[in-house]
């Protein structure tokens, strides 16, 4: 039973104290969280995500038609962090102006990881 990465979420730096971290979730429930800068928990942590949580996230991705969203939401503005979200084989760059439904999906992934790390914010 090989593990395949089915989703990831990465937050990049801004000019302030934006949290910088990387999350990967695999089909077998294995997940990694790597807290880089301005986060409560730093370093690489291995986590176990329930199949139910994975199913909920994948269901939400399907509901918002993730595969057909634009590949990039960006604007000519500086200082903002960038979020890269990947579900299955599609990756989206969310810098500015992404639809609310995409933000909700990002938050779902974050909430599952926050819950596993037993913290309220990154």
Model region roles, listed by residue range:
Residues 22-33, 79-82:
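A short, structured beta-strand/loop element
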Residues 1-15, 39, 43, 64-122:
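Short, well-ordered, aromatic-rich surface patches in folded extracellular/luminal domains
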Residues 18:
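An acidic/histidine-cluster motif and surrounding catalytic segment
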Residues 32-67:
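A short-motif feature that recognizes glycine-rich, charge-decorated loops
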């Amino acid at each position: 039973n090989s593990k395949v990465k089915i989703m990831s979420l990465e937050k990049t730096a801004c000019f302030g104290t934006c949290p910088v971290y990387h999350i990967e979730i695999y089909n077998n429930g294995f997940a990694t969280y790597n807290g880089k800068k301005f986060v409560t928990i730093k370093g690489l942590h291995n986590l176990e995500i329930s199949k139910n949580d994975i199913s909920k996230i994948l269901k939400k991705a399907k509901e918002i038609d993730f595969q057909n969203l634009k590949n990039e939401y960006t604007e000519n503005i500086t200082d903002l962090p960038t979020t890269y979200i990947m579900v299955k084989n599609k990756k989206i760059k969310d810098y500015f102006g992404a639809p609310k439904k995409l933000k909700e999906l990002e938050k779902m992934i974050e909430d599952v990881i926050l819950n596993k790390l037993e913290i309220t914010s990154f």
